[in-house]
């Protein structure tokens, strides 16, 4: 493998991000835990680290060239299994299922800050970039053409159609759109399938239906809304199918143990009633059933294949292979379940 190949791993190029606020929060909290796949397995904290053979693919290293990253923040996967990754340079890069770089582009503005979320909206066949510090949701064609007419937001404020720092976009099977923001208000918004404001809920706090940086959203087969309430270190499950939202369950609590969470920045729903959660603070991924019972866990703090450094986002492809944004290591790792 050549040094200019995006899959080449040069240990000297792998840097460790050391944010001060998370140094103190997560110091000493990471256990060495093994991969058992998303099926029931031993969860001993003395389990051996994830073997490198369990890592199916590694994409990227630190840099500005095509196929390299500077602190990747979000990713999305299209129905054709093209992978899109955005980093702190505001670059969107597209890769095929083998990790080959295909194309890239930048968001229109980035001086105020970079996007922290991204999803592929199958209803409109478009890539949604959550342009956090410009208070908007940008829609692109798969080849990178900006669809101005579909943009949601763009103005900072508290009126309908205005946002704080936006974090994620999710669409229910009936077309309903859910949007999240953090900052002054920490709220979730409900929009029609056509992008018209319906309602909003939440405020900053730690009570049910309150949030502290709701970073990741998902909607299950029943239409229930799942929220990674990251700075409250929990997952909230909400029924908002009618006019008034209702809490269904709250999963997790802060801590380093299996079944606990430390800054869960991303989650995704799997088949067989399973849930994947990546933890920025514990440098790992957990698989739970949808009642919050742990099934498996993998990842240790580090820079070797299978280790993680502040994972920011995750997604699954059509084969339910798991892609993890290993932000502090400037790469994306793919794991097979």
Predicted regions and their residues:
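N-terminal secretory signal peptides
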Residues: 1-17, 27-34
